[in-house]
Amino acid sequence: MKKEFLFACALGLSLTVQAKGHLDITSYRYAGPYLVSRPLLVDSTDVNAKAWSAASLLKTPLSLDAVGQAPVSDADKLPSAPAEGYALHLMQFDLENTAYGKAKFNVSEVKDWQLYVDGKLTDKQEMALEPGTHEVVLKYLSAPGESVKPKVSVDSDGEFSLHQGQSRLYTLADAMHGTKCAGVQVSPDGKYLIVTYLTSLKEGRSETVYCVKETLTGKEVARRSEAIRWMPLSGDYYFVRQGVSGRQLVSVSPATGFERVIAEGLPEGNFSISPAEDYLLYTLVQEGPKERQEIYEVIDPDDRQPGWRNRTYVAKYDLKSGLMQPLTFGYRNAWVSDISADGREALLMVSTHRMGKRPTTLFSVYRMDMQTLEVDTLVEEDGFISHALFAPDARQVLIQGSPEALGGVGMNVEKGQTPSMIDSQLFLMNVADRKVTPLTRTFNPSVRSVQWNLSDGQIYFTAENRDCYSLYRLDPSSGKITLLDVPEEMVLAFSLADKAPVMAFYGESAANSHRIYTMNLKKQKAELREDLSEKLLKGIRLGRCEDWNFVSSRGDTIYGRYYLPPYFDESKKYPMIVYYYGGCSPTSRNFDTLYPFHAYAAQGYVVYVVQPSGATGFGQRFSARHVNTFGDYVADDIIEGTKKFVNAHPYVNGKKIGCLGASYGGFMTQYLQTKTDIFAAAISHAGISDHTSYWGEGYWGYSYSEVSGANSYPWANPELFVDHSPLYNADKIHTPLLFLHGSVDTNVPVGESIQMYTALKLLGRETALVVVDGQNHHIRDYSRRILWQNTIFAWFAKWLQDDASWWNAMYPPKTL
């Protein structure tokens, strides 16, 4: 008996066996036979009045895992069915594809069978598969002594391949699933690590676990679902749990597992433990005045943001007495920035909100004596600082801020330039005389996270180093900064032992996911402790990722990189996707990202990622180009880079280039189309079309304009706000342009896409608008992210691969 199933597959990559039209599947992986027996018939029918039949044995649950590990063999070498008893058999083969198509699967020479595609049983006559390597398993039943050798063939109007290799294509599913590192903490003595693992599962479920491991051996000594951290003195780890009398603070010895309840009835809120473990410093929230829901007054532009009226304050909880002593009071936000190594002092920060002058938020830093509560003001209302740390002896304070902080002592820009408020610098203040020394004024990377190590007195920090997150050591006595040699391009987080020369960190690179390391700070050599990437990418073939830089017509070196398809053939022509942000930050070399570049490359694209003017990580003068330019410099760099890349790489089809950007990058997508016609398709996600409406309506519109449009306002600088807005240049756009937007985007409101889409429709231009319901600036919902990403894939397939089938399947043409 013959059964036929029609599958809509993505078909196109040539591997071992390739065909258009008809393909006989002549080789498989086989597992079996698995004997199954007729059950005891206690009745002649079941609860649905159906009699037992041998065909029901096909529904016997059977794991598909074994067949995936079996060797490949020819179809005519399948083993015969057992002479006695019924048996189940598994046959598996892989179909690989990079483009959307349709295929018809023909199964014959077997009566009872089931088909699984990518691990899921299908009984549909028609189904759609996305581009990738698809595991197809035929599960069939044989009767006693029956000679069964199924035949499978595929008919298609597209091109596809029978994949017989050990590697497969990287897909969106790979980007969305698996176990990643979400944090690493080294114990004070350096002997143990706390590693936080986040596992993303199918259907949007996730699981977080905290593991305590021996640093040298990797042996796991504890695993918990509660968040855990290290006690600073004892070296135990601690967590908070609900007890009979309220919240309990519990410490556990990693060596023995012995638990000790430190405090009962612990107040709610976030806290830090003092170095001597004698008190907790809380940052608590006081709720602000409420308004009626049906009608309400907005007292400040930021009052539209949920929780803006709430204020934080600081309190000290004495672990011996249980006394909670408020340390700050007022209507301004206050929080703990650091505690001195001896626990005698704390650095508190207070923010002041003002309208009428840039910057609209000011920060003060106070040094408070924890015994007397006496306060010393270190910094008073500076709008350009963000963080402060004590030196080990508390005689100096390390301050993090932008170049304009502390009177502009760290500025290093050209005359007429305003520094980027996103470009993060380090400053050293002597507490005794308040003398400030800029530590990174001529240091091009932009500081991210920083710690002052108690063990060796050195300052360690990560920084945006072009498109990498590099790890550095700074000697506070000499000011010398040293780049530490680590195996990863992106150091995502690090932790220092207080009493030993040990660092732990984790990172990733453009071609691998997370790996966890430790480093002996005396030897300065990183040692791999766990390779999560190896598990995530097992059996996956990635295309190459290479650096490609060019010298612009202005004389600047503009950095970039590109990704090639996994089965790249230099003799062929490939469409290309150009990706950029174009705003205040570079597009870093993360492997795990909302825009998985390897997944684009796996669909047959060359992907060029460019770092145009205005990004941090290249020096203050470079990042200052983001200020009061609204697309100038950036557009020139992207256009020039794209043209030069095509000229330098003959395998790129210069007539099939697409571009993609989000947020400020979405604005750049729109703005670019008013400047050039080199793109065959463009996509703007959550892009700004009118700087004035974004400035006034977005939650952070006016405050972000303090960065990008310093001291410029719509009424005072219409040339910047109007002439640089794509909406007022819509008639210049002729590129097919897709707008994507979350329906509840509070950062860049959805109206930014709607009004630009409306303009292009009125102009009769090729455009589309897709709104993702219930999503904000980023598309985080599991199922919606898949649809959103597939929309991007389908739009590019339509215009860059001349294949509209995927787009039409998702968004069928309508006659309205």
Question: What is the meaning of each model-derived region?
Answer:
Residues 20-78, 135-169:
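Accessory carbohydrate-binding/adhesion or oligomerization-edge regions at the termini
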Residues 101-114, 136:
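Aromatic-lined ligand-binding clefts that engage carbohydrates, nucleic acids, or primary amines
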Residues 130, 184-192, 228-238, 271-279, ...:
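Blade-terminus and WD-like Trp-Asp/Gly-His loop motifs, strongest in beta-propeller folds
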Residues 177-178, 197-209, 240-250, 263-269, ...:
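A flexible loop/linker signature enriched in serine peptidases of the S9 family
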Residues 214-217, 253-257, 318-322, 369-373, ...:
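Short loop/turn segments that connect beta-strands within beta-propeller blades
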Residues 532-655, 662, 696-701:
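Cap/lid segment of the alpha/beta-hydrolase catalytic domain
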Residues 609-816:
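Active-site-proximal cap/loop segments of hydrolase catalytic domains
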